[in-house]
Each structure stands twice: as structure tokens, then as C-alpha cells.
Design a protein with these regions (language model features):
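N-terminal pre-triad scaffold of radical SAM enzymes
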Residues: 1-30, 42, 46-64, 68, ...
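Auxiliary Fe-S-binding modules of radical SAM enzymes
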Residues: 2-6, 12, 200, 207-337
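Short glycine-enriched loops at secondary-structure junctions
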Residues: 13-16, 191-196, 242
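Short acidic/His/Gly/Ser-rich catalytic and metal-binding motifs that mark active-site loops
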Residues: 17-21, 196-202, 247-249
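Generic secondary-structure signature for well-ordered alpha-helical cores
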Residues: 26, 46, 50, 182-185, ...
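Conserved non-cysteine loop/helix-boundary elements of the Radical SAM core domain that shape
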Residues: 29-43, 64-193, 197-217
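Short helix-capping segments at alpha-helix termini
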Residues: 53, 84-90, 152-154, 229-233, ...
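Residue-level recognition of the N-termini of beta-strands and the immediately preceding loop/turn
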Residues: 56-60, 92-94, 285-287, 319
């Protein structure tokens, strides 16, 4: 969202979920423990309106649970709480997240009635084996069918996928990304698996039946799928869980939790491009690479990891990264001697 657009989050932790996915503890992940009420909605909107500049376009967002799976009366109460603010222009629309198996024509008609603009579907994977091992309770076809229904009904569609779930491989994650691209969503969220306390996945990890999906693993596979989404022109609106006090305070006990995961992935992608560019370069050379101003830190890498890895891999005397006038994401060999 631009500076004159804002999202007002209201969390409905774990409401509506018919079963517990192995990775999920929404109260710890979202940092919210109390269910949303009409007053929660009113307070969130009024606080946001008071703090945001005049002319800001605000969208109310119901996150953290399967919104369309909660009782219709509860959905209606939350929508009705927002209605006066829609009517007077304080907010422009609503977005919500839900499960693919909680979407049907009647539900979508209700969402239209209450000015919902954006529907986020938690696909997580489009591999049936991974969905089953993760106790998702739905199939890949149900994800695809729900996504098509949402698009055909005129909503903006966001699809969420995870990496490193039980049974996942780099190949299955890439295949999920390709299937998501075929559905033509308006954006995607990518959430590498984090091991959170008080989840079945935590117990599986402790018992040795689940192998941790590390930050390094996530960076590797997310670099592959990010490239696919970039090439398809599908925006990635979030990569990795948002930091919360609970997660940062120790509830994230393993897995791919990093507050700047997206930056690490983009840095890895720049490294991979540099490796291709330098392929065949003789050893003992001095190399100068040029990148866009916005990519200098990504190309150098955290603690100069990319620069030092390139220097070591190609046995260079030195490597220097410079700002130059090229497009973001591109790399140019400026000097080789």
C-alpha cells in the first residue's frame, strides 16, 4: 500500500477453524488472544482514522482466522460494526482471510453485500500429500475451485502459501508456486514454516518426526519461487511472519523465523545472478559489479556474506559493489582486471 493507503488490522485468532493444522497456534502467531467484537472493530477504525492523514484510503482487514467459517451471526455483527464507517467514507472497503473450503456462492454474495473487496485464501500448499500431513482438512482442488470462484465473483484474490511443511520439498514448493501462478491471483503471501510452541508440529519436531525448515532452507526455496512470481508479474505482499512480541520473545522455537526474511531472499537472488554473471571468470581477478542504488546492500549481503562468498568461489583478488544506473534487480560487470 502507498503512503495514502492503509490497512486497519482486526485479528480474529483461530475463530472458525474446523480443525487444528499441525503448524498453527494463531494466538501466539498473531500476538492476539481475545476474540474480535463489534467494539474491537469500532475502536480500531476510530484509532486509525485519528492517526492517519486526511485523504488516506483505509481498508479494514479481518486477519488470523477463517473468517467465513465462523457463525454467520458473528460475521454479520462484525460487518455491521464496520458499516457506518463504510457509509461515511472513513473506510473504503474490507479484506479478510479464510479457508478455501469455507467459500461458496452464498458466502461470496454476503461478502459483496458488506463491501468486502479482497479475499485472502490460505492455500498453504497445492500438494495433496503435504496438505494431508499438515492436517489442513481440504484438498488442492478445493483451493483451486475456491480461487476461481473468488475471481469470478469480482473480488481481489490473494493466495497464501507456505514452505517447509511436513512432506514438503523444494520441488513441491516450486510446483505449488506454479499452480498458484496459473490461478492468476492479484498477490501472494509466502510464509516459511515456523515451529511455534503448543502446536502439533512442535511435538513432531521434539519427537524427531519433523525436520526443521531452517532460515537457510527458506531463503533457498523462496529465492526460487520469488523468481517465478516476479516473472509472472504477481506481487509478493509479504514474505515471512510479521514479528510479534510472542514470537520474538521465544514462542518461535525453530524453523524459518527471521524479521527480515524477504531481504535475505532478495539478497540470495542477487547472489545467484552474480554467480551466473561471473561464470568462467579466471581466478586472481579484481571485479567491480554495478547494481541499482536500491540493491547495493542486497548484493553485498548481510555481514558482506555475498561479497565474500563470490570472492572465495571464484578465487578473486577483490570484489567491489558499486551503484550504477541500471534497473533494480539487474547486475552489470563494470570492471574485470
Amino acid at each position: 500500500m502507498t503512503a495514502r493507503n492503509s490497512i486497519i488490522p482486526v485479528f480474529v485468532p483461530h475463530l472458525g477453524c474446523p480443525n487444528d493444522c499441525v503448524f498453527c497456534n494463531q494466538r501466539r502467531i498473531s500476538g492476539h488472544t481475545e476474540p474480535a467484537t463489534a467494539q474491537t472493530v469500532k475502536t480500531a477504525i476510530e484509532n486509525a482514522a485519528a492517526l492517519s492523514p486526511k485523504g488516506t484510503k483505509r481498508q479494514l482487514a479481518f486477519y488470523g482466522g477463517s473468517f467465513t467459517a465462523i457463525p454467520v451471526a458473528e460475521q454479520t455483527a462484525l460487518f455491521e460494526a464496520a458499516k457506518p464507517y463504510l457509509d461515511d467514507g472513513t473506510i473504503s472497503s474490507i479484506r479478510l482471510s479464510t479457508r478455501p473450503d469455507a467459500i461458496d456462492a452464498k458466502t461470496l454474495a454476503r461478502l459483496k453485500k458488506y463491501s468486502v473487496q479482497t479475499v485472502e485464501l490460505g492455500a498453504q500448499s497445492l500438494c495433496d500429500k503435504v496438505l494431508w500431513l499438515s492436517n489442513r482438512g481440504h484438498t488442492a482442488k478445493e483451493v483451486e475451485d475456491a480461487a476461481i470462484m473468488v475471481k469470478q465473483a469480482g473480488f481481489e484474490l490473494i493466495l497464501q502459501m507456505m514452505t517447509g511443511l511436513p512432506g514438503d520439498t523444494d520441488e513441491s514448493c516450486v510446483e505449488t508456486a506454479k499452480k498458484i501462478i496459473a490461478l492468476r491471483p492479484d498477490g501472494v503471501r509466502i510464509y516459511p514454516t515456523v515451529i511455534v510452541r503448543d502446536t502439533e508440529l512442535y511435538d513432531m519436531w521434539k519427537a524427531g518426526t519433523y525436520k526443521e525448515h531452517t532460515v537457510s532452507d527458506a531463503v533457498r526455496v523462496c529465492a526460487k519461487i520469488t523468481k517465478l512470481f516476479d516473472e509472472a508479474g504477481i506481487p509478493i505482499i509479504r514474505m515471512g511472519l510479521n514479528p510479534t512480541e510472542d514470537l520474538s520473545g521465544g514462542d518461535a522455537v525453530g524453523g524459518a523465523y527471521h524479521p527480515a526474511l524477504g531481504e535475505l531472499v532478495r539478497s540470495r537472488m542477487m547472489f545467484d545472478k552474480a554467480v551466473k554473471l561471473l561464470d568462467g571468470v579466471e581466478s586472481d581477478k579484481r571485479v567491480v559489479l554495478g547494481v541499482n542504488k536500491s540493491d547495493v546492500s542486497k548484493m553485498i549481503g548481510q555481514h558482506r556474506c555475498n561479497a565474500e562468498a563470490l570472492k572465495s568461489q571464484f578465487k578473486l583478488k577483490s570484489i567491489k559493489i558499486m551503484q550504477t544506473d541500471i534497473n533494480s534487480g539487474e547486475i552489470k560487470l563494470l570492471s574485470l582486471d
